[in-house]
């Protein structure tokens, strides 16, 4: 069973995350940040990861702690659920169009966290959501999930479309990387023998 439950409580946020990597993309995400919930829903649906996220954050200050800390907890849950990575494909990529936006994501569930982010968002806000928080989320997810993650905007003029294409492309890349390879069901996908 590739599942995990993570709770994380600080002076800034109180978070619970439950995921099932072998799900169907069922989600119930409530962080108090509407646009972010919409993006988490996309991540769940397109990665086929069942996901429940609850966050009570210091939104009276701003959305930063909520978004970053959910990324931390979700990354921790991903790392726990995938375990020793035995039998997974490991690599995934996706080139995803959404209207004017075209975003490419490529990732390696390597245990070596690294983010390369080349996604310019033309506006500072999407509604009330600070667009710089999109990168903050993926930095936290990559760091705590042990992902090498490259995300690149190839086209786009609408910030909402670009951000959503980023979440969807990462989701599709995750979906591919998390698949189990029936030919290597008990093998670690590395010549080193561990990841």
Swiss-Prot record:
Pathway: Amino-acid biosynthesis; L-histidine biosynthesis; L-histidine from 5-phospho-alpha-D-ribose 1-diphosphate: step 6/9
Keyword tags: Amino-acid biosynthesis, Cytoplasm, Histidine biosynthesis, Lyase
GO molecular function: imidazoleglycerol-phosphate dehydratase activity
GO biological process, one term: L-histidine biosynthetic process
Transmembrane segments: none
GO CC annotation terms, alphabetical: cytoplasm
Pfam families, alphabetized: IGPD
Source organism, top-level taxon: Bacteria
Principal subcellular localization: cytoplasm
Intracellular or extracellular location(s): Cytoplasm
Gene3D superfamilies according to UniProt: Imidazole glycerol phosphate dehydratase, domain 1
EC numbers: 4.2.1.19
Family the entry assigns: Belongs to the imidazoleglycerol-phosphate dehydratase family.
Protein name listed in UniProt: Imidazoleglycerol-phosphate dehydratase
Organism: Dinoroseobacter shibae (strain DSM 16493 / NCIMB 14021 / DFL 12)
